[in-house]
Each structure stands twice: as C-alpha cells, then as structure tokens.
C-alpha cells in the first residue's frame, strides 16, 4: 500500500517506551511502527488534533490519512470508549488510492475491486459519448452515474 503508519502523542518519549514495554510484557507483541513524542503539541495542532484555544492536551483517538504532499485526506474520529476498526481504516486507505489512480470516486459501502464511479461529463459531447458507452456496456444508470472496474484491481487484491 506504500504507506507508513506513525503514532503521535503529546506524551514524552519515556512514557511511550513504558507503554510499548508494557504491551510487549503483557502480550509479547512489539508495536511495529514509530511513535512521535510531540511534547509541545506542534504537530498535533498543525493537523487539528488539539484545539489551539484549549490548554488541555487530552488524548484524542483519531486516525488521519495524510498524503505525500502533507494534505489530510481523511479523518476518522473515535470516542475514547470505542476501539478503532483496522479493516475499515485499510478499506478507506485503499479507496483513496484506487480513486486517485483511477480519477474516480468510490461509492458507499465500496470494497476493494468493486466498480468505481466515473466523474460526470463536463460537456454535452462528453455526455453523449457517456450515454452511448452506458448503452453499449451496461455500466451505469445514467450519464452522470456510470461505473468502471478499477485499473489496478489486482494491486488491491495483493495488498489484502
């Protein structure tokens, strides 16, 4: 998926080490990603993880997908009493990557390798071409809602 997982917390490095060690001692699992100690909250504030007008540094349980240009593409906000859903995070990441590489959108409840939604035509000539394509391939409901199989469908199967 060509993606890096990074933890970020305003806790100290010593606190992170104690947490990682505790996880390892109790479960035998080594956390396989780095955790950044953002003691002054600079990174957390930049991405809106901590409000700039609030002095508290209470932890938030959010997942941010940030692209290689530093743009936040997706934020999943979890209440403190709800665990994260890793399959949904991976599905959302795959959806972003597939949509970007196909210049398309993924519909509600999309799962990898299902058809994606083509962007609507921008001219009347494109509309006529799209309508004919739908009639020929039966790949849409109307000129503004048509689908295609993602170009890199094999990749999303390999990444599972």
Predicted regions span which residues?
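Chalcogenol-based redox active-site neighborhoods
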Residues: 1-160
């Amino acid at each position: 998926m060509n993606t890096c997982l990074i933890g970020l917390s305003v806790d100290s490095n010593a606190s992170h080490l104690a947490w990682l060690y505790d996880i390892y001692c109790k479960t035998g699992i080594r956390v396989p990603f780095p955790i950044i100690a953002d003691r002054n909250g600079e990174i957390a504030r930049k991405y809106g993880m901590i409000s700039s007008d609030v002095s508290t540094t209470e932890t938030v349980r959010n997942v941010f997908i940030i692209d290689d240009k530093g743009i936040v593409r997706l934020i999943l906000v979890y209440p403190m009493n709800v665990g994260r859903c890793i399959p949904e995070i991976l599905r959302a990441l795959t959806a972003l990557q597939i949509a970007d590489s196909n210049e398309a959108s993924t519909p509600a409840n999309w799962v990898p390798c299902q058809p994606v939604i083509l962007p609507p035509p921008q001219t009347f000539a494109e509309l006529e071409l799209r309508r004919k394509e739908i009639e020929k391939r039966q790949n849409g409901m109307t000129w503004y809602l048509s689908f295609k199989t993602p170009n890199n469908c094999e990749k999303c199967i390999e990444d599972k």
